[in-house]
């Protein structure tokens, strides 16, 4: 069955047409701004909110709109600038189709306030879908017109989603306003964001073209311009070409789109742009971008302005010849000034400025063009060297007062305090164990890994004595490891930092699953955030209970969730050192102190029967060889007939020297290994175990304690203070130095890093810091 052809509803037609003309807020503003210029306005003020999406208001002091014309103002094809099609051949105004306001009213809420010179008051009226909503209301107002556009694209969600950020849209608006401000002589422009006290752009009507370019761009652009002019060329229908182009001293790595006005219309002409850039490529140093502003006037009869919905393109007769004429003229202008050029040069010298260069001798010998160029270079070198000797003005509000690569003096005091090897008489507080013995595993199957790391030593350590753990974890708190003298098998020497190093070749890994996990980490890297962490300065702990710390980068102060950061850090270390971990040896010579998995799982009320505990232990025990080989998690079973109740945890992986995870979390570690890890899928399994190890390694929270509370004992207060000092020292001397060296920040932790202050803004408020 064939579909019947039907006429589209008028509202659908109007929305389609509006979508072709009004693509973004900047298109709506351009149309309204051109109407203001056509109305002979001498001042145009623009107000923008949320990139022009929420509010876009333009106010001019032009001729205004007659009250009688208001009912049809926003209807399509209503205009005061054109009566018949032949008038297009002589059109001199920006507008001619009568579609701009109509299109805007179909995708936004429009309110117009206008007053002509003859009226005693202004008139205000609102529009929707091209129709006037109510009769015009008299209001107070000045001569001219104010058009308020609100909620742009409120009825086209797809177009709204396609727009870029508010700042990007506002930048586009500023760019277009600036280009019209440069070209529109005797017309002033201002543009600012809603709520801002200062204008983002302000151009007075009396400004010259040079002043306008200086205001819109900057001084370096305006001070390196030459005037460009071509007189009338009869056979090409070319009336004139006037503008400003950069000279050969102009240096800019940033590309500035050429400003082309053809018959006073802002257009893009790719052929002309390429031709002029080609000319400049013969003169400017490689990598420099030129500045070009040209106003081209062509006989209106030779120009077709009705070729693009947004009027950004025009077609004209003798296009190739006109472009060639302009390019040749530019070549001639640049050739004329290519006899001399100023270069920035500097010299390093310890002598007095007068002895740097024999400047007078060089000037006296200036007899020809070559020596003139040499003199210019010498003069500039002398000036630069002289200025370098002067003390540069220090900008206090942009001064970075600390060096991220410089260590604090306290970092040299911590190494001797990390471990104690003098026996069991002196016991560490908190959950950090005292290291007394180290062993290592020599079994490691060689795999292939795309890593560039050299073979290194395998690090393994023993730990003992956990203090101040919750009562229900008493068996971990009582756990002790005998001193070195108690074990005759310890024949390996202990280094000053408390580790026994045994030469062990690095295992090469060629597992596809691990490669994919590493690629996934690489793909998730946020470059800017990684740079912040790589060049951070650690400030201190803000809240030990919520695991918040402050860091500084450059001129900014950030608040970070160090728990989240450490989780990602240890996961990445696990991926990098996969199958190459050192060992933390947990098993004691005293059998009663061994860590039995069954006892650890007894901490959980939901595992109230032997079967549920043994189910978890069975999963882990079945994978014990893999856990030992890949993760240095060694399990042993001394029971008869491999009784699952006798499975013991002998070792944990060592991810970072100087840091031992809190063994208080061992019950949760074993529980989650059995419950949360997917043991069926290889990649999910390897990833899940690494994440559980990273979770184990996250520093403990330190619950807040009111030290002024009289009900607390002195031991409890001292314990709280010691735990705070311990976590602070651990973060400053162990974890954050590792974060600076190794951490690749993923995008999803952006929510865990918050900028709380920056130096320039603080100076704006306090005028000092």
From Swiss-Prot:
Effect ascribed to mutating residue 274 to E: Reduces DNA-binding and displays a 1700-fold increase in spontaneous mutation accumulation. Strongly reduces DNA-binding and displays 12000-fold increase in spontaneous mutation accumulation
Keyword DNA repair carried by entry: yes
Phenotypic consequence of residue 309 to L: In strain: M2-8
InterPro entries named among the record's database cross-references: DNA_mismatch_repair_CS (IPR014762), DNA_mismatch_S5_2-like (IPR013507), HATPase_C_sf (IPR036890), Mlh1_C (IPR032189), MutL/Mlh/PMS (IPR002099), MutL/Mlh/Pms-like (IPR038973), Ribosomal_Su5_D2-typ_SF (IPR020568), Ribsml_uS5_D2-typ_fold_subgr (IPR014721)
Region span, Interaction with PMS1: 501-756
Modified residues (Phosphoserine): 441
Subunit note: Heterodimer of MLH1 and PMS1, called MutLalpha, which is the major MMR MutL activity correcting base-base mismatches as well as IDLs. The heterodimer binds double strand DNA independently of a mismatch with positive cooperativity and has more than one DNA binding site. Forms a ternary complex with either the MSH2-MSH6 (MutSalpha) or the MSH2-MSH3 heterodimer (MutSbeta), which recognize and bind to mismatch DNA. Ternary complex formation is promoted by ATP binding.
Protein name as it appears in the record: DNA mismatch repair protein MLH1
Organism the protein comes from: Saccharomyces cerevisiae (strain ATCC 204508 / S288c)
């Amino acid at each position: 069955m064939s579909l019947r052809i039907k006429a589209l509803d008028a509202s659908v037609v109007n929305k389609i047409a509006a979508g072709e003309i009004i693509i973004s807020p900047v298109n709506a503003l351009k149309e309204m701004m051109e109407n203001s210029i056509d109305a002979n306005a001498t001042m145009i003020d623009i107000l923008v909110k949320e990139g022009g999406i929420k509010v876009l208001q333009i106010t001019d002091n032009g001729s205004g709109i007659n009250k009688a014309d208001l009912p049809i103002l926003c209807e399509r094809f209503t205009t005061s600038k054109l009566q018949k099609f032949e008038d297009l051949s002589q059109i001199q105004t920006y507008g001619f189709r009568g579609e701009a306001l109509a299109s805007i009213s179909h995708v936004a809420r429009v309110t117009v306030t206008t007053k002509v010179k003859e009226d005693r008051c202004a008139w205000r009226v609102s529009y929707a879908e091209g129709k006037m909503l109510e009769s015009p209301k008299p209001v107070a107002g000045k001569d001219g017109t104010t058009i308020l556009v609100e909620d742009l694209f409120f009825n086209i969600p797809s177009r709204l989603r396609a727009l870029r950020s508010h700042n990007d849209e506002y930048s586009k608006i500023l760019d277009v306003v600036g280009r019209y401000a440069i070209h529109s002589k005797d017309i002033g422009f201002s543009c600012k964001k809603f709520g801002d006290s200062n204008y983002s752009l302000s151009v007075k009507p009396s400004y010259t073209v040079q002043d306008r370019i200086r205001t819109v761009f900057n001084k370096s652009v305006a001070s390196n311009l030459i005037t460009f002019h071509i007189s009338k060329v009869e056979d090409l229908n070319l009336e004139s070409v006037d503008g400003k182009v950069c000279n050969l001293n102009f240096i800019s790595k940033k590309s500035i789109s050429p400003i082309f006005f053809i018959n006073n219309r802002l257009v893009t002409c790719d052929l002309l742009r390429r031709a002029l850039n080609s000319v400049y490529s013969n003169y400017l140093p490689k990598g420099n971008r030129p500045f070009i502003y040209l106003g081209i006037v062509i006989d209106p009869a030779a120009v077709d302005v009705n070729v693009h919905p947004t009027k950004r393109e025009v077609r004209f007769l003798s296009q190739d010849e006109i472009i060639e004429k302009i390019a040749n003229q530019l070549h001639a202008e640049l050739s004329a000034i290519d006899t001399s050029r100023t270069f920035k040069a500097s010299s390093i010298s310890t002598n007095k400025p007068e002895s740097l260069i024999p400047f007078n001798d060089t000037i006296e010998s200036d007899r020809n063009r070559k020596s003139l160029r040499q003199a210019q270079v010498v003069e500039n070198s002398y000036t630069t060297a002289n200025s370098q000797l002067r003390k540069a003005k220090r900008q206090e509000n942009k001064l970075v007062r600390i060096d991220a690569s410089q260590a604090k003096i306290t970092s040299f005091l911590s190494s001797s305090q990390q471990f104690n090897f003098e026996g069991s008489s002196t016991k560490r507080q908190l959950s950090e164990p005292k290291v007394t013995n180290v062993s290592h595993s020599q079994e490691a199957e060689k795999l292939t890994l795309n890593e560039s790391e050299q073979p290194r030593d395998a690090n393994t350590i023993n730990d003992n004595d956990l203090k101040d753990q919750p009562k229900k974890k008493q068996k971990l708190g009582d756990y002790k490891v005998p001193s070195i003298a108690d074990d005759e098998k310890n024949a390996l020497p202990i280094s000053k930092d408390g580790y026994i190093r045994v030469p062990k070749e690095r295992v090469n890994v060629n597992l596809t699953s691990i490669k994919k996990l590493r690629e996934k980490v690489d793909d998730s890297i946020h470059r800017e955030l990684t740079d912040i962490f790589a060049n951070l300065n650690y400030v201190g702990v803000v809240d030990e209970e919520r695991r918040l710390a402050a860091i500084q980068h450059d001129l900014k102060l950030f608040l970070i969730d160090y728990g989240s950061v450490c989780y990602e850090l240890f996961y990445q270390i696990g991926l990098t050192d996969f199958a190459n971990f050192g060992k933390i040896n947990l098993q004691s010579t005293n059998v009663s102190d061994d860590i039995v998995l069954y006892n650890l799982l007894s901490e959980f009320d939901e595992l109230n029967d032997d079967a549920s505990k043994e189910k978890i232990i069975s999963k882990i025990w079945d994978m014990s060889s893999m856990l030992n080989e890949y993760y240095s998690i060694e399990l042993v079973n001394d029971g008869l007939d491999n009784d699952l109740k006798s499975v013991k945890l002998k070792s944990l992986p060592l991810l970072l020297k100087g840091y031992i995870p809190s063994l208080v979390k061992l019950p949760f570690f074993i529980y989650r290994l059995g419950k949360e890890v997917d043991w069926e899928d290889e990649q999910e399994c390897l990833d899940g175990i690494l994440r559980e190890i990273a979770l184990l390694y996250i520093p403990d929270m330190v619950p807040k304690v009111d030290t002024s509370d009289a009900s607390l004992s002195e031991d409890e207060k001292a314990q709280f203070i010691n735990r705070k000092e311990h976590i602070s020292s651990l973060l400053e001397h162990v974890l954050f130095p590792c974060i600076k060296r190794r951490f690749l920040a993923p995008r999803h932790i952006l929510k865990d890093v918050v900028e709380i202050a920056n130096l320039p803004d603080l100076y704006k408020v306090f005028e000092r810091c």
